[in-house]
Amino acid sequence: ILVVPSAEHHLDTDLEDEVMLNFVKKVNKDAEFITSHCDGAFVLAEAGLLKNKVSTTFPTDIEKMRKRYPNLDIREDVLFVHDGKYITSAGGAKSFEAALYLCEYLYGKNIAESLSAGLVIDWDLANVAHVVIK
């Protein structure tokens, strides 16, 4: 699992960092899942990983992402999107929802609930705005 965090204050330079982008592309070949949080979705898009995928990003940056990547399907009003091996999230404190979702997906509801209790988060996937593409 590769986790791509927010690139706040470094987004422009990160999107020009060929070493990092090539690393993400290389890891993508064998990764079971790649998650992005906040503006980390821009890195996935720049690496070409979100072509023909549905994604999201930090709410106030959705329009910026749509302008930069006009051919991508970028959703708003959701906390995370799971499409294939990619899970993109709105980020911030809401990154926990995407992480708990992946834990539930991989290990079951009981494990996700146990983890959420340790984080003092009321976890119920049915109450989390999200999109899952099959």
What positions do the PLM features span?
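Active-site-adjacent pocket-lining segments in enzyme domains
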Residues: I1-K134
